[in-house]
Design a protein with these regions (language model features):
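Intrinsically disordered, low-complexity segments enriched in small polar residues
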Residues: 6, 15, 19-20
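Small beta-barrel nucleic-acid-binding modules, principally OB-folds
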Residues: 88-104
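A conserved, well-ordered hydrophobic junction motif at loop->secondary-structure transitions
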Residues: 58-74
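Active-site helix/loop of acyl-thioester processing domains in fatty-acid/polyketide metabolism
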Residues: 69-89, 157
Length: 173
């Protein structure tokens, strides 16, 4: 396809030329979403993140945005931390009630996960998990809320059976 006015293209580099897929092709450069469209916010005051991590290139697509599955797994871990504390023992994820991606996470952005117990049932604990990013780790000036979710966990006994949340697990022999 011939270049059109106003479109930006990147020529293949030497390693790409070795692949027959990229010979005599041009790759269109897509611009990331403008940060003007993503509202900036502040980190939740008076709360401590249960998980903080910096995504690396293997966690992202070719455009530098982190995969949704990676974000979901980190949110599940963060929610499980709160659920384990409330259930005072092992838990297992049984449902992802809601999961909303509000903005993309880019490689290198410190991502903070906050989790709170939203509801306690007989054997289950539902946790609200929120994810925020700091664009510049050394001088966090751009903070964005990037995702929120509700996860449900079930308290498990030593036989991997549901147990009441308020009943402490028995010690394993």
């Amino acid at each position: 396809m011939p270049p059109r006015a106003g479109m930006r293209y990147a020529l293949p580099n030497r390693s790409m030329l070795q692949s027959s897929i990229f010979i005599r092709t041009m790759t269109k450069i897509r611009r990331p979403p403008s940060s003007r469209n993503i509202p900036q916010t502040e980190l939740p005051s008076g709360r401590t993140p249960v998980l903080a991590i910096v995504p690396m290139p293997p966690d992202a697509n070719p455009h530098g945005h982190v995969f949704g599955g990676w974000i979901m797994s980190q949110m599940d871990i963060a929610g499980a931390v709160a659920a384990v504390q409330r259930a005072r023992g092992r838990v297992s994820t049984v449902a992802v009630n809601t999961l909303t991606f509000l903005a993309p996470i880019r490689v290198g952005e410190r991502t903070l996960f906050y989790a709170d117990v939203a509801r306690v049932g007989n054997t289950s604990v539902t946790c609200k998990v929120e994810a925020y990013t700091e664009h510049n780790i050394h001088a966090p000036t751009e903070v964005r809320k990037v995702s929120e979710a509700l996860f449900t966990y079930v308290a498990m006994d030593e036989n991997d059976q549901p147990r009441p949340v308020d009943q402490p697990p028995t010690a394993c022999p």
